[in-house]
Amino acid sequence: MTTYLEFIQQNEERDGVRFSWNVWPSSRLEATRMVVPVAALFTPLKERPDSPPIQYEPVLCSRTTCRAVLNPLCQVDYRAKLWACNFCYQRNQFPPSYAGISELNQPAELLPQFSSIEYVVLRGPQMPLIFLYVVDTCMEDEDLQALKESMQMSLSLLPPTALVGLITFGRMVQVHELGCEGISKSYVFRGTKDLSAKQLQEMLGLSKVPVTQATRGPQVQQPPPSNRFLQPVQKIDMNLTDLLGELQRDPWPVPQGKRPLRSSGVALSIAVGLLECTFPNTGARIMMFIGGPATQGPGMVVGDELKTPIRSWHDIDKDNAKYVKKGTKHFEALANRAATTGHVIDIYACALDQTGLLEMKCCPNLTGGYMVMGDSFNTSLFKQTFQRVFTKDMHGQFKMGFGGTLEIKTSREIKISGAIGPCVSLNSKGPCVSENEIGTGGTCQWKICGLSPTTTLAIYFEVVNQHNAPIPQGGRGAIQFVTQYQHSSGQRRIRVTTIARNWADAQTQIQNIAASFDQEAAAILMARLAIYRAETEEGPDVLRWLDRQLIRLCQKFGEYHKDDPSSFRFSETFSLYPQFMFHLRRSSFLQVFNNSPDESSYYRHHFMRQDLTQSLIMIQPILYAYSFSGPPEPVLLDSSSILADRILLMDTFFQILIYHGETIAQWRKSGYQDMPEYENFRHLLQAPVDDAQEILHSRFPMPRYIDTEHGGSQARFLLSKVNPSQTHNNMYAWGQESGAPILTDDVSLQVFMDHLKKLAVSSAA
């Protein structure tokens, strides 16, 4: 008999799904009392090297309002060649190609191990991938040079049939014609005036690519359609490499005390319009590189006077940021246009000051694009991260999907409340759509323009079965996720994941439901909800909501005597959940103090799209200790773990930090590691560096690497994350363990837990 932990892990590996509850309460009333909703973290393109895609199309239910895909949960009559849909119970005839099936000769989609299966659609033309580079030229020469080299490197990684385009901008916006031999030609637009797609079409003389009539069977490889601005790499590789090499800083003079005039808003608008006019509904990436904030035209985020700083959270709270609303509105309109036509927008922002990510965040957030933030294009952080965008799988294809749509089908006792993640609604109302919206709701279909193997959506459900309508003993609820997308090879693919979970009566089987709780998934699902609310609500209100939910969960599932906090017990399946909430409350996702609006937008962007493992690291960083007393070991994220004779390695997802304790730091300063008799000390210093390199080489985006020591200025990154169990207030308490006192007024986990128990057991609550 597998344990729940094994069951959860197997499901995640096979289907890319983690549910908050793995046994579902059988009535609406009981489900609302569970506090944490029935919800799932779903990774549509979860990598599964063991199951290659199958070269035929899925069999669909014949009922027009259902159209669910044949799956292992369907009942099959092999003699009559019929199958019953497990969602609407419609009886369907198998297509003629299934004539040879029997109990001993089953198609893959009926085998339980293929609860997730990927089909290749053989109809329709194979479209080329499109990459449109949008480059800011208002930056220092060495930054621009490094960026040009990175872009030239990326050209060498693109498939020869991929179409590429180039737009550069500063005070003006230039759309470069790439088909010209021996001459550079470009169309120049004013950076202060926005253009509609229609105006752009007329000015550039563009036409839409005709989509050829879909035909069955393999396609004869036709040359990819193109125009003067988007050309196949194989044709213009040398030309474009030379053109990038010749790119100069924006020639307009910048007076002293002024910022350069930068037209980011118009440049992105032209990029969106260009693709909209020529390649709607074809996989395309707009890759925008910016070295500072937009200072003119639509989408500007700050004026050109250097004495006026760019907005802070304080300015926004005091309604003293005059460009925020207008700028955000401009970029939201562009994001929605790009999402409608299925195009991805990436933003690579490298500058020492803010660049306007707060206003632009909707572009990557709604289109599934990447957001990368760094200090300079001339750092390994940017160069390595950008190179990883073009990572390839074992078949030599990019690990990116384009133009995805996710459709969810449910059995009749459960409905869909909504999704939180890098998606937009397709407004598809159906029988399985709930009235109660959470996140992007009111639909059972979403568009995800850009997908990677780790792109993860949070999907929230509502149990709608009435209290007085019992579900038959042994009944199961089913959910089907159907993801259609354009593979980087140009093929259309459909991935279908069908899962089922048992129902239980919460009045008689509450133990079964409690035992099925997945506290890690629940913590991330509640965190996404809290961060989603934080975008529109006041910070303290969100924290109060989070606390209230936690107290209610403790009251529902804790064991205690009324008004006796010391009697409170939480079972193992819930014991880590309060700790996750404690670290979430202190995290940069909900605490904006000490972060710029751009930094907050950047952190939230990544949390809203990463899978469970990475999201947990973001909430509760991992801490490893290295010492002479044994091999490296994970230790508590607590100030008591900071000891003089230890080296600590902390992984926060965004940073990898190595911290040397006081004694270790003194030995290192004295150079003991260079003496042959202290070789073991040299090995001790090297061990965390090797482990850090392993993480740095695999993560996207590449984390910031920090090497610090006791008393070092950057030790603050560690001190701000650990639980302050020792502070300046209690460091001299009798019997206090050794460790580093933290100078903070924040409450410790112990105080937080004591307070939580007191509130949970209170009869007044």
Curated annotation (Swiss-Prot):
It is a peripheral membrane protein. SUPFAM superfamilies: beta-sandwich domain of Sec23/24, C-terminal, gelsolin-like domain of Sec23/24, Helical domain of Sec23/24, vWA-like, Zn-finger domain of Sec23/24. The modification N-acetylthreonine is found at residue 2. One of its GO terms (biological process) is intracellular protein transport. Keywords: Acetylation, Cytoplasm, Cytoplasmic vesicle, Endoplasmic reticulum, ER-Golgi transport, Membrane, Metal-binding, Phosphoprotein, Protein transport, Transport, Zinc. Gelsolin-like repeats lie at residues 632-718. InterPro entries: ADF-H/Gelsolin-like_dom_sf, Gelsolin-like_dom, Gelsolin-like_dom_sf, Sec23, Sec23/24_helical_dom, Sec23/24_helical_dom_sf, Sec23/24_trunk_dom, Sec23_24_beta_S. One of its GO terms (molecular function) is GTPase activator activity. Zn(2+) binds at residues 61, 66, 85, 88. One of its GO terms (cellular component) is endoplasmic reticulum membrane. The keyword Hydrolase does not apply. The modification Phosphothreonine is found at residue 308. Transmembrane segments: none annotated. Belongs to the SEC23/SEC24 family. SEC23 subfamily. The Gelsolin-like repeat mediates interaction with proteins containing PPP motifs that include MIA2, MIA3 but also SEC31A. These interactions are probably competitive. Component of the coat protein complex II (COPII) which promotes the formation of transport vesicles from the endoplasmic reticulum (ER). The coat has two main functions, the physical deformation of the endoplasmic reticulum membrane into vesicles and the selection of cargo molecules for their transport to the Golgi complex. Required for the translocation of insulin-induced glucose transporter SLC2A4/GLUT4 to the cell membrane. COPII is composed of at least five proteins: the Sec23/24 complex, the Sec13/31 complex and Sar1. Interacts with SEC23IP. Interacts with HTR4. Interacts with SEC16A. Interacts with SLC6A4. Interacts (as part of the Sec23/24 complex) with SEC22B; recruits SEC22B into COPII-coated vesicles and allows the transport of this cargo from the endoplasmic reticulum to the Golgi. Interacts (via Gelsolin-like repeat) with MIA2 and MIA3; specifically involved in the transport of large cargos like the collagen COL7A1. Interacts with DDHD1. Interacts with TMEM39A. This is Protein transport protein Sec23A. The gene is SEC23A.
